Amino acid sequence: MKPFTFYEAIESNKRKTWFIVFIIYFLLFFVCYAVVSYFELGEIGIIIAFLIVLFTNYYAYQKSNEIILNYSGVREPTREEYPYLLNVVEGLSIAAGIPTPKIYIMDDPSPNAFATGKDPQNSVVVVTKGLLDILNRTELEGVIAHEISHIKNYDVRLQTIAAVMVGLIVILGDGLKRSFYYSKRRRDKDENILGIVSLIIAILAPFLATLLRFALSRQREYMADASAAMLTRYPEGLASALEKIAKNFQPIKRANVMTAPLYIVNPLSSNAVSKLFSTHPPIEERIRRLRMMGERWKMLDKEG
C-alpha cells in the first residue's frame, strides 16, 4: 500500500465521518416517521419528535463536560507537580491555534487520556497517572496532540450528538416494538403492511445506528491520529506511545460504555468484542498508519 500524507488521511476521514453522520440522522428521521405513522400522530407528532431531538441535543451539548468530569473523578494538578505536562499542553495548544484547555489528572494506573468540552473555549484534557508514569516527553507530546486534535476538530460535540441520536433511535425503536406486540391495536394490524414495516424498522434501526456510532468513533480516532502527526511533525512519537499503552493496558474503573469513545484507547475490557462493535480501531492498525505517514513525510523531504 502506498504511504499517504497527513492531509490525505484527514480528508479521507472527514468524508467518511459526514457520510456516517448523514446515515444516523436518516435513520432517526426514518424511526420518527415510523412512530408518527404507526400511531397516526400527524403533523403534531412530527413537531413533537423534532422538538425532542432539538432539546436532547442542546442539553447534551451544554452539560456533557460537567457530567463526564464528575463521573470520572479527576483532579486539577499543580504546576509544581507536573510542570512538563502543563508545558506540553500549552505549547501544542499554541501550535494548534486554540485556547489552552484545562488539565486534569485521573489517579488510575492504566495509561490513557481523553478530551472533552463542547468547543475549544470550554475544553479539558484528562490524562491518567499511569500514562505519565510510562511515557517520555516525545510520546506524551503525541498523546496530547491527539487529544488537542479532538478538541480542534469538535469531536466531543460530534460524539455527544451522535450518542444522543443513537439513544433516541434505540428508545423510539424499543417503544415501537412494545406497542406492536402488546397494544390492543395489534389484532387489527397483523396483516397491515405499515405495522410490519414499522416493526422491521424498530428492530433494525437501533442495531444499525449503534454500529454506525462505533464506526464514527473509529473514524474520528484515525483522524485525530493524523492531525496529531501533522501537529507534532513526528508520527513516531504517538506510534511509540500507543505501543506502550497497549503493552501496559488495564481497564479503567471509572470508565463506562458512554465515556469509552472519548479515550485514546478503549478503557474497557475488550474480550471477544467484534471489530464492528469496537469504539476504537485496532491499535496495531493505528500504529501502522502512523508509521506509513512518517515514511511518506521522509520521502517528501528527500524529494523536496
UniProtKB/Swiss-Prot annotation:
One of its GO terms (molecular function) is zinc ion binding. Its cofactor is Zn(2+). It is found in: Cell inner membrane. The keyword RNA-binding does not apply. GO terms for biological process: proteolysis. Its EC number is 3.4.24.-. Keywords: Cell inner membrane, Cell membrane, Hydrolase, Membrane, Metal-binding, Metalloprotease, Protease, Transmembrane, Transmembrane helix, Zinc. The keyword Acetylation does not apply. GO terms for cellular component: plasma membrane. Binds 1 zinc ion per subunit. Pfam families: Peptidase_M48. Belongs to the peptidase M48B family. This is Protease HtpX homolog. It comes from Dictyoglomus turgidum (strain DSM 6724 / Z-1310).
